[in-house]
Amino acid sequence: SALKNVIYLCKLIKNVYFCNSLTTVLINRFMINRVLIRLKIIQIVYAYYQNGSKNLDSAEKELFFSLSKAYDLYNYLLMLMVALTTYAQKRIDAAKAKLASTAEELYPNMKFVENKFVSQLEVNKQLLDFVANQKRSWTNDEDFIKGLYEKIIASDIYKEYMASPDKSYETDRELWRKLYKAFIFNNEALDTLLEDQSLYWNDDKEIVDTFVLKTIKRFEEKNGANQTLLPEFKDEEDQEFARRLFRRAILNCDYYRHLISENTRNWDLDRVAFMDVIIMQCALAEILSFPNIPVSVSLNEYVEIAKVYSTIKSGSFVNGTLDGIVNQLKKEGKLTKN
């Protein structure tokens, strides 16, 4: 499909450092923020033009479905830590049940399976609500869980934790922050597994990983099962931002492309990378449709996206073209904000 093609394209050319550093700066108290919204809109707008039907309502539904799938992945990755702990407990139970169990098997070190952070996560009300409404679970991927668990228990991170007498909540939480960064964050086997489960997750993992790490850091023992997870959207304003930006980018396409063409006269627009055109089209939709967002903020966001999601020279090309358009619109009195 067109969407699959663009997600594959983005996966090939994206820069992990960019995704991690950008989201680290901008995520605070909510999962889906405007960084992710902009990226998703560019993908969906790209797919819209690659798809012959060009149905605006269907494309908008696809946008919000895609955003909701990113939030599903966030919850699913939180569940992975619980699944690994559950598997560890099963291993302990199986070893105890053997006819000739060793002393170590009969009286194992329970520190990992009794980890206070995971115990809190396991009973988290919001996560349990998610689990109750999902057919998907990690129980169908026991081979993957087994392999990941064995890598964890062979690691120095695990061994040092198990040998330490420190049983504080903070130490338990820090263990999972370290394990997540070491074994889940950049895990090709997990990436493949998730890609097989959902097309949308292929391009979301690295960004969502950052949200999960942020969540681990925010957990506090005193909050118990009521610890809040990151909400899907900050508020209705961000949902409206996504809807309005997407529709303006499509409905005002001819005007935006006219502006782009006027400011790339030394270029044949057909020879400009199509992804660059889409990025600039979305950037102009934002600059001209949202008076409260400073021009510099929009320019910086889309130039950074171009550096990662298009060609090597796209960042400077998009920056120069958009800067020229902004100056032109200001001279004509069509753009008054700074």
For each feature predicted by the language model, list its residue ranges.
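Short, positively charged and aromatic/hydrophobic N-terminal segments
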Residues: 7-11, 17-27, 41
